[in-house]
UniProtKB/Swiss-Prot annotation:
Positions annotated to bind Na(+): G78, T81
Annotated control of activity: Na(+) is not transported, but it plays an essential structural role and its presence is essential for fluoride channel function.
Gene Ontology CC annotation, any one: plasma membrane
Purpose: Fluoride-specific ion channel. Important for reducing fluoride concentration in the cell, thus reducing its toxicity.
InterPro entries (UniProt xref): FluC (IPR003691)
Reactions that this protein is recorded to catalyse: fluoride(in) = fluoride(out)
Coiled coil ranges: none
Similarity comment text for this entry: Belongs to the fluoride channel Fluc/FEX (TC 1.A.43) family.
Pfam annotation, one family: CRCB
Naturally occurring in which organism (per UniProt): Mycobacterium tuberculosis (strain ATCC 25618 / H37Rv)
HAMAP family in alphabetical order: FluC
Protein's UniProt name: Fluoride-specific ion channel FluC 2
Residue spans crossing the bilayer: 5-25, 44-64, 68-88, 99-119
Length: 126
């Protein structure tokens, strides 16, 4: 095995391990928020996605080396945030005829997500 191959394998193992940490943290944050707030709206998923957008914006603002960005961005933040759960919860709100909540979930997630990413980048650059 060459040094380059060994480094690539180490990075991918790191992404898997750090991704595991990100997914466990997502579970803990989601459940903690969901326990404290109304169950009719997916506040837990909203919380992880907004904080994840802020963190990814922050990491992007740092201009990390490629391997560090892969570990932190793809590994941790990619596992911490969840597009698929956001879509499923929005679809379920629609199924339950909670159209205002479904639309609010989309609009609030996109607007706050963009704002959080911009804020994260700004913080990294000061």
């Amino acid at each position: 095995m060459t040094a380059s191959t060994a480094l690539t394998v180490a990075i991918w193992i790191g992404v898997m391990l750090i991704g595991g940490i990100g997914s466990v943290l997502r579970f803990l944050v989601d459940r903690s928020v969901a326990r404290r707030l109304a169950r009719t709206f997916p506040y837990g998923t909203l919380t992880v996605n907004i904080t994840g957008a802020a963190l990814l914006g922050f990491l992007a603002g740092l201009a990390l080396p490629k391997d560090a960005a892969l570990l932190a961005g793809t590994g941790f933040v990619g596992a911490y945030t969840t597009f698929s759960t956001w879509m499923l919860e929005t679809q379920r709100l629609g199924e339950d005829r909670q159209m205002v909540s479904a639309l609010a979930n989309i609009v609030v997630s996109v607007v706050l997500g963009l704002a959080a990413a911009l804020l994260g980048q700004w913080i990294a650059q000061i």
